[in-house]
Amino acid sequence: MSGKILDKMAGLLGLEDDLEEDLEEVEEETAEEEVTPLISSNTKRNNKVVSIHTAVSAKVKIIKPCSYEEAVDICDELKNRKIIIVNTTDLETKIAQRLLDFMGGASYALGGSLEEVEKSVYILAPSTVEVTNELKSQLISSKGIFNWNK
């Protein structure tokens, strides 16, 4: 009943026509808008196929430094994610120790690892490479590779 009274008053004041025109405009605007889906049906879903050929091959560099100044170059190679084998047999003991300290600090800072392969031969590996030395654990457990003294 109150709706009829309001309609009559709106008609008397001339507001009825404006109200109907506004409603028609809103209906036209909503009809003209196109609905775009958030997820298109053309896209691939959960593509979990990995190409075998995308694997990057690891590069190994063997270095036999002649001086301590080569430590920066060795660590730059480690920074570039290369595996480095360093042979320090030709260096004096003090210089080899300084070089080893520098390489150890750099490998720690870069998240890599430094392992002794043999006396005066070391391997530096980036954080993406895991180095295990099973030979060293065999030496410790059996007191030698070939246990001649039983």
Swiss-Prot record:
Pfam family, one: SepF
Biological processes per GO annotation: division septum assembly; FtsZ-dependent cytokinesis
Subcellular location(s) of the protein: Cytoplasm
GO cellular component, one term: cytoplasm
Domain of life: Bacteria
Role, per record: Cell division protein that is part of the divisome complex and is recruited early to the Z-ring. Probably stimulates Z-ring formation, perhaps through the cross-linking of FtsZ protofilaments. Its function overlaps with FtsA.
Protein name per the record: Cell division protein SepF
